[in-house]
C-alpha cells in the first residue's frame, strides 16, 4: 500500500511522469546548463523502494538490516510492511514489528539491506495509511490525542504558508495582535 495510491493510478501521476520525462529529455539536450539548474539531493535508500513495493504487493515480510541514528551498530530483523510515505525528500516505511508487537516507522536512508522473505502476512482489514498519518506532521504519530495548534507569523511568511500549506488541516484564522495566524490539528511533537 502506497499512500496516495489513487494518484499513482490516475491521470495526475501520468501527467507528472510525462512532465518529468520531458524535463529529463530537455536537460540531456542542454548539458551546458548543469551548473545553472540545481536539484535538491535525495538521501540514500531509494534502492530499497523496489523490493519494499514488491513485498507490499505480495504481502511478504521483509528482513532488513537497519541502523537508527541513536544506534552505534545496525541490527537485522523481520517486519511486515504496511505503507511507504515520502516526507521532505525522504522515504519512510511504516511496518509492523512482530517482536515489538507494534507498528514503527523506518527511514529508508538508514537501511543497510532489505530482503523479501517467504513469510506471508495479512494487512489488517481496518488499516488505512492516509488515516494513520492524518494528524501527523511528517511521520511522527504519537499515542496522545491530536490538538489544535495555532501559530502567528509575519505577513511575509504567511504568504509562503498560503501557497504551500504545511499540513492538510491548516486553516488561516483571525489575526493575533495584527499578525496572520494559522491553525493546525496535529499530534503535538
What label would you give each PLM region?
Residues 1-67:
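Bulky hydrophobic/aromatic content
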Residues 53-97:
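Loop-centered beta-sheet repeat module
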Residues 75-77, 102-106, 149, 180:
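Short beta-strand segments
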Residues 84, 114, 172-173:
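A structural signal for short hydrophobic beta-strand segments in well-ordered beta-sheet cores
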Residues 87-91, 98-100, 117-121, 155-159:
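Short, charged/polar surface micro-motifs in flexible loops or helix N-caps
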Residues 99-132:
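Flexible linker/loop signature enriched in Pro/Ser/Thr and Pro/Gly
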Residues 131-189:
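Polybasic (Lys/Arg-rich)
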